[in-house]
Every structure is written in structure tokens, then in C-alpha cells.
Regions:
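Catalytic NTP-binding/metal-coordinating core of nucleotidyl cyclase/transferase enzymes
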Residues: 1-68, 75
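Catalytic beta-strand-to-alpha-helix segment of the class III nucleotidyl cyclase homology domain
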Residues: 58-169
Length: 169
């Protein structure tokens, strides 16, 4: 199955658990991950699963995936800026297109691994994508692509050409 995989992660959630305690922090994180999943589904994605403070979503169309994560990043970043500094959890997002295998509602494959690694590697409030995810994406106001170059991704022999999706309006 050819698809675009989106992996999101909340940066700084460990400190929020320390500040708020388990119950309140869990509620806060769950509200955000639920919202991310809903936004992706509304944009045409399929929620595969949430994993703690992360969300894994598949999109049939890479432009839909990129548009969705740009809107999510804009809305979430605005919310982060209104939060007290010790409760800020900016989002990191990795996007990768490629082949995946579906097994019992879960997805496996290179694109899943690359999206997860890009999510780990990018900075807070950033979106990183592989070349396959952005090669048909239309840039416009508030959505530009900046090539970061070939980046070595753990577990892969070949470096991966990575783009940063600039989403600031």
C-alpha cells in the first residue's frame, strides 16, 4: 500500500507530568493527541493509533497530509505560546511517503520507520518530511519547503533527503 505516514510527538511532556502530576498531565496529553487524530481524520487521514504523547496517521494523498500537519502545527503552536512556560509541549512532526503493510489495523514498513525517525530528529514546532512526501506538494503562502539535505537515519543504509516544511504565515 502506497501511503503517506504522519508521526507526531509532544516535546517536553515528561516535564509536564512532573509539574502537573499523572492524572492532570495524562488528561492534558490525551486531549491534545485526540485533537490531532480528529484533525487528521477531518483532513482525510486514517488514525492508526496513539502512543502515549504520539499519534500515527496514514494519508492516501501527501498534499492532504502536509496541509493537515501545517494547520495542526499552526493551531498547536498558538496554544503553546499561551501556556505557562513550564507546561509548554511543542509538537514535532515527521512525514514520510512509501510502501506500508497493514496487519490487524496497524501499519508497518519503511515509511513508518522514516516518519518516526524524522519526528525524533526534528526540533520543537518543526515538520520534517522525506522527498517522496513532498515531491508533489504545492508550495504557497504559509507553506514552503526547505531542503535540509541528505540525513543519515538510524537503521537505514542510504541517507535520506529531508525537507523542512516551513509553516509560519
Amino acid at each position: 500500500l502506497q501511503t503517506t505516514v504522519v508521526f507526531t510527538d509532544l516535546h517536553g511532556s515528561t516535564a509536564v507530568f512532573e509539574a502537573l502530576g499523572n492524572a492532570l498531565a495524562t488528561q492534558t496529553v490525551t486531549q491534545i493527541t485526540t485533537w490531532v487524530g480528529q484533525q487528521c481524520v477531518l483532513a482525510g487521514g486514517r488514525l492508526v493509533k496513539t502512543l502515549g504523547d504520539g499519534v500515527l496517521v496514514m494519508f492516501a494523498d501527501s498534499q492532504d497530509a502536509v496541509n493537515a500537519v501545517v494547520e495542526i502545527q499552526r493551531a498547536h503552536s498558538a496554544r503553546v505560546m499561551r501556556s505557562p512556560p513550564n507546561l509548554r509541549m511543542p509538537m514535532r512532526i515527521g512525514v514520510a511517503s512509501g510502501e506500508v503493510e497493514m496487519v490487524a489495523g496497524d501499519c508497518y514498513g519503511d515509511a513508518v520507520n522514516v516518519a518516526a525517525r524524522l519526528c525524533d530528529l526534528c526540533g520543537p514546532s518543526q515538520i520534517w518530511a522525506n522527498a517522496a512526501a513532498v515531491n508533489t506538494v504545492h508550495e504557497g503562502p504559509g507553506l514552503t519547503l526547505r531542503v535540509l539535505g541528505p540525513i543519515t537515519i538510524r537503521g537505514r543504509a542510504e541517507p535520506c533527503t529531508v525537507y523542512q516544511i516551513e509553516w509560519h504565515e
